[in-house]
Amino acid sequence: MFQPLIDYLRERSVLILGFGREGRSTYRLIREFLPEKEISIADKFPVTIEDKNVNLFCGDGYMSVINDFEVVIKSPGISVRDVEIKENVTVTCQTDLFLKFGGCKCIGITGTKGKTTTSTLTYLILKAAGINTALIGNIGVPVFESLGNAEKMIPVIELSSHQLEFTRTSPHIGVLTNVYPEHLDHYNGFKGYVNAKLNIVRNQKENDIFIYNADQGISEFIDESEIKSKKIGISAEDAEKDPFLKELVSCNPRLLGRHNRFDILLAATAARALGIEDKFIRAGIESFDGIPHRMENVGTYKGITFYNDSIATIPEAVMCAVEALKKVGSLIIGGNDRGLDYSDFIKDLSGCNVDNIICLPETGHAIGNSLKEMGSDKNIIIAKDMDCLLYTSP
């Protein structure tokens, strides 16, 4: 599979934009197959590398060199919205190059929330069915690390909006779990964020499959006539119509809550689209043993059970966890302000079954003060930092 990609890069000037985990992975691949090729690396932070054929551009002005190259392989999370990119410059990423040159049928999964769980469940189902697969992408494994075996496998790729932003090739099976406002600071608004997410389906062909959340719908985000692939809308009600699915969504006690049940439905639908038998779907779901930071039971102390749900960075995810766990004594909230509207979240918190709401900077303080102003009967604790909580008794 390497050859088409290597041929593409061989005759073009290449800039690796960002030298984190994915950038280093890109460098290793190019250097392995093109040992003498001149490579340029740009990063805001210092880069140390012993390679006579590498040019480094580091520091605050690292973005200024983008238009000096034919191909820019960008790391996720680096925003180039303030750079006027010339027409002869191709800004791409590992994900796009993998989908374009990989020569395999990929399952790509994205969404504001649920993509990691859905990706993991899908991967476990494929493994249970004896299919050669890999779980790669936003889950923490750069896609280039599976490049060598791509033609012989069906990889499951977790795709963030950052990875999709410059992806112009869509996977054979694309799954969109949901879309809620997030990363608005990066995309300068909700529209830009949604446009990035929709690259998962935008370039699919007639023989491809797009699985989406029918309860939320997609018509407000994209003209459905633009979608060339087969569309499969999944609703929570589907579990009631199918005896197997009805039993499946409750077969694993680690997958609590309606959001996890929906992730199961999406993964099962993707597996069925590949022709996988129900017995393997069930085996895969049953083998799931949880994901760190997602309603993770971290232990019990003095009769109090603690859950780490720190991946819940939007209000909808927080409320799903509160609903799934039933009786929550204390909820700790806070984090950076990314420009989200918290008005509905404040109302939901005021009416939910939580006794104590502990508010950390910076969003937590604003939410806590709003709850106090509206006369909420919750015990609102405004804390300076986590250390202060050790000396605070609700």
Residue ranges and their predicted role:
Residues 391-394:
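Conserved small/polar residues in nucleotide/adenosyl-binding loops
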Residues 13, 37-38, 132, 172-173, ...:
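Residues at the starts of beta-strands that form the adenosine-phosphate
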Residues 28-32, 63-69, 76-214, 218-228, ...:
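Phosphate-binding loop of NTP-binding sites
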Residues 43, 59-60, 92-97, 228-241, ...:
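Beta-strand->loop->alpha-helix junctions that form or flank phosphate-binding loops
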Residues 40-44, 211-213, 332-333, 355-362:
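Short internal beta-strands
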Residues 3-13, 23-29, 33, 251-355:
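Nucleotide phosphate-binding/pyrophosphate-handling subdomain across enzymes
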Residues 1-108, 129, 286, 292, ...:
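Short, basic phosphate-binding NTP loop
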Residues 20, 45, 139, 216, ...:
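Residues in the short beta-alpha loop(s) of Rossmann-like NAD(P)-binding domains
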